[in-house]
Amino acid sequence: MKLTKKRIVLACVAAAAAGVAVSAIASSPATELTPVPSANTKSAGYAPASVLSRELEQIAVAQGSTRLENPSAAVAYYGYDNDVLGPGGQPVMVPTPATPVEAQKTEPDKNTYLVFKNGLSGGTPGANYGTRFLFQGHEAGSPGYITRINLDADGAHRVTLLATSDKNGNPLPVFDGSTWEPWAQRLLFTAERGNAGGVWAATLDVPSVVEDVSGALGRGGYEGIQDDSDGNIWIVEDVGGSNKPGTTARRPNSFVFRYVPAKPGDLHNGKLQALQVLRAGTPITFESQAPLASPDQVALHTYGTSFPTRWVTVHDTATDGNAPFDANALAKAKQATPFKRPENGVFRPNSKFEEFVFTETGDTNATSPENDCCGGWTAVLRLEQSSPSADTGTLSLVYKGNQAHAGFDNLSFLSKDLLAVVEDAGDTLHTQRNALDSGFVLDVTADYSNPANEPLRWLAEGRDPSATIDAGNGGFGKNDQDNEITGIHVSDGDPTTNGILGTKTPHPWEPSGQWRVFYTQQHGDNPTYEVVRPEK
């Protein structure tokens, strides 16, 4: 029997419940995955290994203790600052009785994979760095910095430090998101720092020339960042709102933005717009979502409903100039619609950039009274437009989470319909539900209002010993604790405009090997993994 997408989801759920392997359920290796039946549990001193679908394996391409080929005085390793040194002059990566402290972990974050047929230069003249590269910013420490994993290089040249300061000598902020802007020929990095955050553009050079472009793209708690085929840049914000009185439910406080450049590749002149959602002809706003379980929030998170949208311009360099500005405050003033920490978004492949899917991470607390009604557990939403530059569209709910599927953060398409999403549920929710983070596959064509349809777990993340030590010692006052999953990234590395994510249908784990899958197990040892399908 030929399996439809709905049947694929149902088959996976039924097999998971019965403990039966799911294999050969469709022609693409992305769908030939055995579900991992449950998440790893959490308890003091317990450091379980990660469990992947049996068809998959992961290979560390770098980890926090990988030494940079061109270290600086402040930064010498992929995942550690030089702020606390041991007797041997190296960062204290694991506490000892004699040195019961740790160096600052720098938390490598979102990954961007690129292939350059003629290679790139590095920190060592004459070294062979190959053609395949993985770029990332770092989310913690001081200064912030940018690195490049040279996937084809030897150990001594595996990771290159690109920059710790901008072109004016200012220390870089810590970074979350990243993408490649093919028209500008720049890497773009986002800083999730509220009205001190924004977007920085970096060249491929070593050292990289890095420029703060927040005079056009604004300042905000920016995380997710993607191009579209018209040269617009879509930015998804993560700014946690204040608690609603007397509860652990948090106010929606983060926006989805679209930067429309004067021409593709122009990072200095253009308009920043924010998404506005309307209900019964009235904008859903920061104020309208202030009451507990507000009607607007409930409506947005109800299966089968859809809402008209429009883009409102919050800043135009032609009339407002090029001084950095607070994008979040302007979006509120223009009555744009905030969400519960949307964090990241991607375009559905082969949709002509007419479908944009984004997550809401939610409240990450099992006691939130808005978990079931309002996206407090998590949600996946879909924006549909007639073109990527259209002024209007429609927003609808793809998936509403529950305790076992919560805190969705990063996402990346595995095929036209199958979406990989990963949890960042956080230490509090890990403890409350006795479950660490997982990675799932959602089918964006499935009807998740039917409780028989559930996401397929492809990864039950573990907790490495370093993270377990941090969890038992409060991170030594500086470091994060439980591991989280970040930087899930599926790409063929095409640096041209034809390679913008969403242009082509991904084909990971196929014999051609062009499409590759990466993620980082953030915190603890901070390994960055490539997920592969071993040869049978």
Language model region names:
Residues T4-I25:
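Gram-negative bacterial Sec-dependent N-terminal signal peptides
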Residues I25-K536:
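Conserved small-residue
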